[in-house]
């Protein structure tokens, strides 16, 4: 498939898939060979400033000589913007190669009776495969929507960051700041540190 055909295929995914559980995403990574293993992942959620925080973290790590992968969404012009390696968008050639490797895993998933990954899951899988192929040490992940049930929460980070929280995506995350904060806080775990931006009183209670 050409680059253009691949992008068209990915854009069509929402038409024939539905939201999956985190277990489905973990199964997907299993078929991919668990590219997330051995990576130092920093997970970022919040309402405002997620993209900026991710960019700062990526730049700081590279300034210290670390190899980095950066996964953000949405893209503005080109799908490659979502998958960044050492400060540079993935090339069209590498994008195509990673797509083919991911599709091979997806076909094996479907043969095993599992559903096709969603649009976001598919791009997340491609990103993690790209970072693994390139031998990236650190990966900065921006949540797509919320946190608790977001596909990016299927991997184990070394740290997480929650930026300021406000009213957003209320049709999915809840009608109040407290409910939305609960969804965002779903990225917090017991085995790693969480860095929290100063929040409204309703969020921190």
Residue ranges of model-derived segments:
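Short, surface-exposed alpha-helical segments at coil->helix boundaries
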Residues: 4, 22, 96, 204-205
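Residue-level preference for the first positions of well-ordered beta-strands
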Residues: 41, 137-138, 193
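ATP-dependent carboxylate-amine ligase
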Residues: 1, 155-156
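Residue-level signal for inorganic ion chemistry
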Residues: 10, 47, 68, 140, ...
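Glycine- and other small-residue-rich loops at beta-strand/loop junctions that grip anionic moieties
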Residues: 46, 120, 196-198
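ATP-dependent carboxylate-amine ligase catalytic core
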Residues: 29, 34-37, 63-155, 171-174, ...
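Conserved catalytic-core segment of NTP-binding enzymes
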Residues: 145-149, 156-205
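Short functional linear segments
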Residues: 1-46, 53-64, 71, 107-114
